[in-house]
């Protein structure tokens, strides 16, 4: 083997090593990016409101009941943001480690809209709907929990409509009709039945 062919072989191996290093770096970067994308976390801006006592209706799947829980959270003065903060406090319970009604960690309320007198539209993300336990009772508990929490803290609400990622969805997780409005008075009757069991 001549020195010229040895030099060419060495250069080829050198460039091959550089190309492999770049490839490994690219694969590693892509894997890190995908890992961060698979773990959605709810990021809430620091609250500048005043601490207030709110009433949460918490679903408990195991006994199949609703329980009222009072918590103190910082609330904004703006109605939509205040309502969203209350629902996020409820979701913090559901996404917690020892949750009585488990939801996926990425579950969130995207927005809340007060459309006309008495009607509020709650836009949740797909992680909340997709992470919901399928079954009539768990789904009824979830919807009733949201509606009762809203009406307990904002008595002017008489109807609640849900959207998932800004769109109507036929069912929550296969059973409870999620496409229509929920009347607070009817849900209050259901809540009384579910909280007395």
Language-model-derived ranges and their functions:
Residues 1-197:
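Bimodal "functional hotspot" detector
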């Amino acid at each position: 083997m001549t020195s010229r062919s040895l030099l060419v072989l060495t250069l080829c191996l050198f460039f091959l090593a550089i190309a492999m290093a770049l490839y490994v770096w690219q694969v590693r970067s892509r894997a890190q990016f995908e890992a961060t994308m698979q773990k959605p976390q709810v990021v809430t801006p620091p609250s500048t409101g005043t601490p207030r006592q709110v009433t949460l209706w918490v679903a408990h799947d195991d006994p199949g009941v609703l329980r009222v829980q009072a918590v103190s959270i910082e609330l904004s003065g703006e109605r939509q943001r205040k309502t969203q903060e209350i629902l996020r406090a409820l979701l913090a319970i559901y996404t917690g480690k020892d949750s009585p009604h488990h939801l996926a960690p990425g579950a969130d309320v995207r927005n809340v809209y007060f459309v006309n007198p008495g009607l509020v539209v709650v836009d949740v993300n797909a992680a909340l709907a997709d992470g919901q336990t399928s079954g009539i009772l768990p789904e009824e508990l979830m919807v009733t929990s949201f509606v009762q929490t809203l009406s307990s803290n904002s008595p002017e609400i008489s109807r609640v409509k849900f959207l998932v990622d800004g769109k109507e969805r036929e069912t929550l997780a296969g059973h409870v009709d999620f496409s229509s409005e929920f009347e607070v008075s009817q849900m209050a009757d259901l809540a009384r039945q579910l909280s007395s069991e």
